[in-house]
């Protein structure tokens, strides 16, 4: 089997990807048997290509699955932890923009009664 490109895999359905994954795993097991029995050098070098192809197929499956989950949870109040933006612990606990701008009644009254003085300078 030739080297598989990820862009070719992205257009396929999940069933096709799973079938291709099974085929690649079967091929890998056959190549490993050939390695033990003393197979040709071409078969031995093919093991690496097949392993990388399996990784590509699994990557595409996982990425599409995560993308679908993102679409499903878009606009919902709660999201799974792995779909939330990755930030530091301190950044997650920080006040949001709205909470930072809130003022107490006392503070609002003080600002209203004693506004900032503006001075005009005579040239």
From Swiss-Prot:
One of its GO terms (molecular function) is structural constituent of ribosome. Residues 86-96 have a biased composition (Basic residues). Gene3D superfamilies: 1.10.287.310, 6.10.250.3450. It comes from the Eukaryota. Keywords: Cytoplasm, Ribonucleoprotein, Ribosomal protein. Its main location: cytoplasm. GO terms for biological process: maturation of LSU-rRNA from tricistronic rRNA transcript (SSU-rRNA, 5.8S rRNA, LSU-rRNA); translation. GO terms for cellular component: cytosolic large ribosomal subunit. Residues 85-113 are annotated as: Disordered. Belongs to the universal ribosomal protein uL29 family. Component of the large ribosomal subunit. Component of the large ribosomal subunit. The ribosome is a large ribonucleoprotein complex responsible for the synthesis of proteins in the cell. This is Large ribosomal subunit protein uL29. The lineage of its organism: Eukaryota, Metazoa, Chordata, Craniata, Vertebrata.
